[in-house]
Amino acid sequence: GTLVMLHDATVDRTTDGSGKLSDLTLADLQKLRLRSDEGGAQAPLTDQRVVTLEQMLAKAKGHILLNLDVKDAIYVQVIDAVARAGMQHQVIVKTEAGIFTAPLAAMPPFNTVYFFPILINAHGTADLAAIATAQARNAHPMAFELPKMAAAQLPALVAVSKKHNVRLMVNSLWEGFIAGYGGDADAERDPNKVWGRMYRDGVSIIQTDAPEALLRYRATLEAR
């Protein structure tokens, strides 16, 4: 098969087609048009087509860092494609890690790329700092991706982050992943209150659907 860039297991939400991705040929896929924004039947169609991972890597090479959200147990194949493209230091690869998960950043294939373990916050009460500590044992992930979590869980994670020199990444998508900090809509109104608070409290990588606004805010910090 061919590795392609698509979020869902079906093409229904994000394209003008229907059916399972695994049932379609590459030729079938490349006839489909992508829908705008988050997709859905009411979302306007664009002139954009589904692209392969190889095409995406070639387009991004030398320009941007790609966050590859791998949707199946195909990490070896994905990272092999990244290596063939010579982009091991231009992609982020992530997978979930719990308290009993071995330190993944030290293991193939994750040890060849920028790897972020996604900390599992079981029932919203996990000892995230302990999971992060375990993931940094004889390993050096580039960052810990934070799950939806309580604000009270953050300080201990910041301490682990500083001790092991591993950055913290958080989503400000939707209502945001740290309770009480706010999300993208709040940040576009008052970036210092949301993104600024995250940064001041120890987060240095933010995933957002408002990248232009975040870049503008970051520029104000750099100018200080």
Listing of model-derived features with the role each one plays in the protein:
Residues 1-6:
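Acidic helix-start/capping segments at beta-turn-to-alpha-helix junctions
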Residues 7-123, 149, 164:
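Metal-dependent phosphodiesterase/phospholipase catalytic core, i.e.
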Residues 43-45, 123-224:
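C-terminal active-site rim and adjoining tail of enzyme catalytic domains
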